[in-house]
Amino acid sequence: SLEVEILDGRRDPKGSLSQDQYTVHHRGHTSYDLIVVSVPQGRIAEAMADLHTGGIEGPVLLFCGFWGEREELDRLMAGRGVLLGYPVAGGSITRNRLACCVFDHVMLERRDKARFPGYERVEALFGSCGISLERPHDMLEWIWLHMAINAGVGAVAGMYGDVEDTTRTAVICAHGSSLML
């Protein structure tokens, strides 16, 4: 069983908090239309190995802050269809509890750059959930830039904020945009 706490920002920018308990059902098939993998960069190989070892087939929507080149990603994916995405929001799992948030959009690799069958079905899936898609010219470059900006913001927050009071630090950074210049 998995306890889920989600801050849903699709309709209200401040978010709506929901909590529920879900029963986890282990896979019943070996082939899927879509496998969503959301892991840190250093865990992609492990996730792909787990799918391979389990005999699980299907294209992967990879939500990951990947720093490498396309050739490295292709090697890690070992021939599996892959679509790069970035959820903009996020979360974490600790033991049997998922705490996360979702916004009204995600970043998704453009169709002409994706190595992914069924792109239209993924578009329809997000649309049915009230989540719009932003498609940068080059998804890998967008991820690199996003991660670099986050590192800069984190450095400034660490310099001017208080690691013991992250809420106050966020307010300082949000209202003191000149700190970021």
Annotate the PLM regions.
Residues S1, Q41, V60-F63, Y86-G91, ...:
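Long, contiguous hydrophobic alpha-helical segments, chiefly transmembrane helices and signal peptides
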Residues S1-G15:
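Glycine-rich phosphate-binding loop and adjoining beta1-alpha1-beta2 segment
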Residues L2-I6, H26-H29, R75-L83, S132-E141:
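Short, mixed-charge, low-aromatic patches
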Residues R11-L98:
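Rossmann-like NAD(P)(H) cofactor-binding subdomain of soluble oxidoreductases
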Residues G54, G79-G81, A99-L181:
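Internal alpha-helical scaffold of NAD(P)-dependent oxidoreductase catalytic cores
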